Structures are given as structure tokens and as C-alpha cells.
């Protein structure tokens, strides 16, 4: 474990890059965050705008960049009983034709959603319409077609098996382009607020109310024009990437973030239902007799207790959670210990030891393929080398670092893996 002098920070690993430490220090150098209790998870690595593995309560301020662009991303786990050998190639073909991935969306080349999934589709569509930032979204019609689709990069569909022979369908994906757009909209707003835009809006609203009350509505347009002309931006007190929201803009962000979380939840469950329905129709899976219930672990969000988890999951006492390791080694199923010193959190994965660029340049396709022997996958290719097992921290390192926050109750190993390129 590492600490950073003069701050209430604990980093639950010794394996952390210098630039990740600098990202943490940059945030804590901002006066309003200096005294915050920050806990960094063992899968820590540098990220875009904020370190991955960040947890903390930032009070009445929100930095959209910390939550990031894949709001509500998470992993959904659907246990099932396998009653007949699964045709893995047929499953792969089903996914390719029914679950668009990467930059794909539902269009003429993908199979239409069956009627039984229309309730989920309609709810997802209403979520997009209900966003407070809806007017700033681009291409809403395409957003409607993203439900039931898988992201690229580290997102995946897996079928895993445990030591007693129970199977698990594991879905890792998030809010897709919807979450990215919402994150970008609010980060731009946060930057504007640091330049004085929020104060300008307050003056403008007060002016509108006063002019209307005085019966001077016809003069408003010119008065507002002059107000904007006289506005001078102030020098921002924080770096652009750490700009924050307060007050009603914070409330707007929280509202839309939670809607994106719900959208991502629907997305994962729809993918899981599509696949389990296919497995049942093939006579390969029995869902009804499986005593284990589905569950999910979400990262990239702000909890109701105001804890931000960026690349981290909740691990409250008794909470079931999943920590994926890599494409070869599978995942840990755990029960949270509710350790408040960890902000009741756990890592959302093993954590990268290579950047995507490093992985592409240093890992050979042959080594990648050898590492995946024994697992059925048609996804081992040049475009997914950045997700090979060697790009991630060793499983034993993560297992050794999490004993104070979770109890490991099961290890599930992949027998099938599907992954799309970024």
C-alpha cells in the first residue's frame, strides 16, 4: 500500500505508474478537494482525465471527467445449468448477427429485436428523451438503435464455468455512445462554469424575472444582448479536465448520470436475455432450475452515498460482486466486507500493465493465441491484441491485494469468449 504525504489518500497496491500518481496529486492540489478521503483500488492505472480505480466523496462538487464517458458501465452475471454441449461456433454466429458490437448499432444488417424485448427498447428510448441534456444530444435516432449492443475495447461476452460445473453468462458493457455524449456535454458545461458562465446565467435569469415583472418584456432581447457583450470570462482555478459542477448543474448531471446507469443496465440484461433465450431454444441451457440468481457490479458512477467510483465497484457488507481478471483467467465472484477504509469499494478488474499502444506493439499474435488455448474464441486477432491476458496485471497480485475488502467465494473460468475491436 502507498500513501501520499499531506493527503487522506491510500493506494492499495505498490504497483502504480508515476503518471497515475501525478493524476491523483493534480486532483488533490485543488483546494476544494484537498481534505477529501480518497481510496485508490489495486487495479489502478492512468486514465483519460482521471486515474482508473478512483473512489471518493467530493462533497457538493462533481467532476464529470472522473466518472468518465462510459457512465454506468458494468458486468452482468447470469448463472445457468448446461444440459447439453453448446455449439460455440453457432453461438458466435448468433452474437454476430443479433448483437451489434464495437461501433455497430441495430440496422438493416442485424436481426430485428423480437417483440418480447420491445418493453426494454421502449424504456431505453424514453430514458434518452427524459435526459435534461436531451436538446444537446446528437443523432437521437441512432442512440435508440444502440440498446442491446456491445461496446468495443475491454467489453466482452463470456461463458464461464466453475469447479462444480455451473455455467455463467458474463456481459461487460455500458451506456455506449449515450454515456459518452452525456459525459462530454456536462464536462463542457463544467469548463464553462469555471469561466464564470454559471454566474452569467444567474444574472440573466434575474434580469428576465425583473423585466417581466416590470412589464418591460419588449426590452429583454436587447438587455440580454448587452449583458452577453459585457461578459468577461474569469481565469479558471482548475485545469480544464478537472472542471467541476455545483448547485443545479450538479443536480442535472446526477439526474442524467442515473438515467444513463439505468440505460446501461437494460442494455446488459437485454444482451443476456437474447443469448440465454437462444441457449434454451438450442436445448443447451436450463435457467429455471438454477438456484444461483443473476447479479451485476457497476463501475463509473456516483452512488447514493455520494461515493464516486471510477473503475471501481461497490463492496458493501454482504454484497455479491464480480471482479474480472482477463480473457484467460476468468473472474472472481466475491462478497463485500463493507470496509469503510476502502470506501466500501473493490477493484473493477485486474488493471492494465500495458497501455493499448504498448500491447499492440509488444505482444505477438502467436503468443496471444497460445495464451488462449483451451478457450473457444473467434476474437483472437490483431485488432484485439490490446486485450490479451499479458496486457493486464497478474491475477495473484490482485487476489493478494483485495482480502481486506472482499471475500472470494468462487473463481469462474472462461470456456467461450467474444470481444469486439475498439
Which residues fall in each region the model found?
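Acidic active-site catalytic centers that drive phospho-/nucleotidyl reactions
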Residues: 42-43, 70
Amino acid at each position: 500500500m502507498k500513501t501520499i504525504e499531506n493527503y487522506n489518500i491510500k493506494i492499495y497496491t505498490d504497483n502504480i505508474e508515476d503518471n497515475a500518481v501525478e493524476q491523483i496529486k493534480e486532483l488533490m492540489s485543488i483546494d476544494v478537494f484537498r481534505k477529501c478521503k480518497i481510496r485508490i483500488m489495486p487495479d489502478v492505472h492512468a486514465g483519460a482525465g482521471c486515474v482508473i480505480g478512483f473512489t471518493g466523496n467530493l462533497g457538493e462538487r462533481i467532476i464529470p471527467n472522473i466518472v468518465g464517458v462510459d457512465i454506468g458501465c458494468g458486468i452482468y452475471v447470469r448463472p445457468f445449468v448446461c444440459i447439453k454441449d453448446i455449439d460455440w461456433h453457432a453461438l458466435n454466429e448468433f452474437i454476430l448477427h443479433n448483437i451489434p458490437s464495437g461501433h455497430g448499432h441495430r440496422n438493416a444488417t442485424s436481426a430485428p429485436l423480437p417483440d418480447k424485448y420491445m418493453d426494454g427498447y421502449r424504456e431505453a428510448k424514453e430514458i434518452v428523451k427524459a435526459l435534461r441534456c436531451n436538446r444537446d444530444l446528437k443523432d437521437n435516432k441512432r442512440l435508440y438503435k444502440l440498446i442491446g449492443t456491445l461496446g468495443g475495447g475491454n467489453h466482452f461476452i463470456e461463458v464461464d464455468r466453475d469447479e462444480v460445473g455451473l455455467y455463467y453468462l458474463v456481459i461487460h458493457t455500458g451506456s455506449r455512445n449515450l454515456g459518452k455524449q452525456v459525459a462530454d456535454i456536462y464536462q463542457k458545461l463544467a469548463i464553462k462554469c469555471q469561466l464564470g458562465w454559471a454566474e452569467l446565467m444567474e444574472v440573466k435569469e434575474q434580469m428576465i424575472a425583473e423585466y417581466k415583472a416590470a412589464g418591460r418584456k419588449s426590452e429583454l432581447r436587447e438587455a440580454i444582448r448587452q449583458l452577453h457583450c459585457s461578459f468577461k470570462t474569469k481565469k479558471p482555478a482548475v485545469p480544464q479536465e478537472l472542471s467541476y459542477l455545483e448547485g443545479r448543474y450538479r443536480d442535472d448531471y446526477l439526474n442524467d448520470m442515473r438515467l444513463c446507469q439505468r440505460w446501461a443496465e437494460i442494455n446488459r440484461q437485454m444482451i443476456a436475455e437474447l443469448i440465454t433465450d437462444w441457449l434454451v431454444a438450442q436445448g443447451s441451457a436450463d435457467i429455471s432450475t438454477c438456484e444461483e440468481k443473476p447479479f451485476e457490479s457497476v463501475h463509473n458512477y456516483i452512488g447514493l452515498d455520494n461515493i464516486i467510483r471510477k473503475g471501481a465497484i461497490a463492496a458493501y457488507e454482504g454484497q455479491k460482486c464480480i471482479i474480472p481478471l482477463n480473457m484467460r483467467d476468468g473472474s472472481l465472484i466475491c462478497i463485500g466486507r463493507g470496509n469503510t477504509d476502502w470506501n466500501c469499494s473493490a477493484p473493477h478488474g485486474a488493471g492494465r500493465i500495458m497501455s493499448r499502444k504498448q500491447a499492440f506493439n509488444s505482444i505477438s499474435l502467436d503468443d496471444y493465441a497460445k495464451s488462449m488455448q483451451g478457450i473457444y474464441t473467434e476474437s483472437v486477432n490483431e485488432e484485439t491484441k490490446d486485450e490479451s491476458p499479458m496486457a493486464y496485471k497478474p491475477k495473484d497480485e490482485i487476489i493478494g491485494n483485495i482480502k481486506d475488502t472482499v471475500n472470494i467465494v468462487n473463481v469462474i473460468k472462461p470456456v467461450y469468449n467474444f470481444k469486439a475491436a475498439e
